[in-house]
Curated annotation (Swiss-Prot):
Pathway: Amino-acid biosynthesis; L-methionine biosynthesis via de novo pathway; O-acetyl-L-homoserine from L-homoserine: step 1/1. Keywords: Acyltransferase, Amino-acid biosynthesis, Cytoplasm, Methionine biosynthesis, Transferase. The lineage of its organism: Bacteria, Bacillati, Bacillota, Bacilli, Bacillales. This is Homoserine O-acetyltransferase. The record marks S192 as: Important for substrate specificity.
């Protein structure tokens, strides 16, 4: 089944080239189907790239999804054309009287700041509070996961001596959790961050369950409130060349950055990246949508 997006959204052409089934809003209203309402709070400066990454994954399921893109009203986005935001995005004020089946909160390049120093922290707090009663399940990614763990449970983040950068092996910690249905006992996921949350802090919170971690990269997946909140510290949504682009960008800026681990063939940045995470990335998003959104949401929101 398709994802429903605006016919002029640039990501639509990218997805159609990859045979992802997309449908315009005009076509969707002719069908007698209650599509799942999914909001994506896009905190990334590379908005169009992030749109394509997430739509690619959530569009690869049998479910029909009505996608709403959100941006922060209290933050000026400098890396995206204003007409793109005006045409395709809403603010929290636009949707705060609605209910959603699912919400995705992305990462953001603000992790070296304390949460309270982030200029949109107050607005984000209102959205996360809203999600507790107006969203069936919320998936938090990378910094979005750190923010959610801190806001809802007081779990702190800690600076890393070096950037966690690359593709890392993870172990499943809980075998009988629906989010990990079909997962191998060991799987890969990308990470790209300067801070971490610690397993010991998550284990102190009885409402949280640690699902997967890595000896090298630390915590990757956790859930709270029986799946109403899902936290993914890695980037299972990343495209093949996302880490490559981040590495080249940092090199151009003159930053002292290591080659992303376990990513390039022979660990040589002049060679092609090796994708090890795509199947489990698709499985993570499809399991979230099926077991924690579709199976749990009421027909009438």
């Amino acid at each position: 089944m398709p994802i429903i997006i605006d016919k002029d959204l640039p990501a639509r052409k990218v997805l159609q080239k990859e045979n992802i089934f997309v449908m315009t809003k005009e076509r969707a209203v002719t069908q007698d189907i209650r599509a799942l309402k999914i909001a994506i709070l896009n905190l990334m400066p590379t908005k169009q790239e992030t749109e394509a990454q997430l739509l690619r994954l959530i569009g690869n399921t049998p479910l029909q999804l009505d996608v709403h893109l959100l941006h922060m009203e209290s933050h000026l986005s400098r890396n995206v054309a204003q007409d793109h935001l005006t045409s395709f995005y809403k603010t929290f004020r636009d949707i705060e009287d609605e209910k959603f089946d699912g919400l995705i909160i992305t990462g953001a390049p603000v992790e070296t700041l304390s949460f309270e120093e982030v200029d949109y922290w107050e607005e984000l707090g209102r959205i996360m509070e809203y999600s507790k009663t107006n969203v069936t399940s919320t998936l938090h990614i990378c910094w979005g996961a750190q923010a959610g763990l801190y806001y809802h449970y007081g779990v702190p983040k800690y600076p890393l001596a070096e950037k966690m950068f690359g593709v890392f092996e993870h172990e499943v910690r809980e075998q009988h959790v629906k989010l990990l249905q079909g997962f191998d006992e060991v799987f890969f996921a990308p990470h790209s961050r300067h801070t971490e949350v610690r397993e010991s802090d998550i284990e102190k919170v009885k409402e949280l369950t640690l699902l997967a971690n890595s000896e090298e990269a630390g915590v990757h997946l956790a859930i709270g409130q029986e799946g109403r909140q899902v936290f993914a510290l890695g980037h299972s949504e990343y495209s093949c060349d996302t880490l490559k682009q981040e590495y080249e960008r940092d090199c151009q800026r003159g930053l002292n950055i290591d080659v992303p681990k376990n990513y390039f063939k022979h660990n040589n940045p002049n060679e092609k990246p090796i994708v090890r995470w795509r199947s489990h990335g698709n499985l993570l998003f499809s399991n979230w949508l099926n077991y924690y959104v579709y199976q749990e949401t009421p027909y009438i929101l």
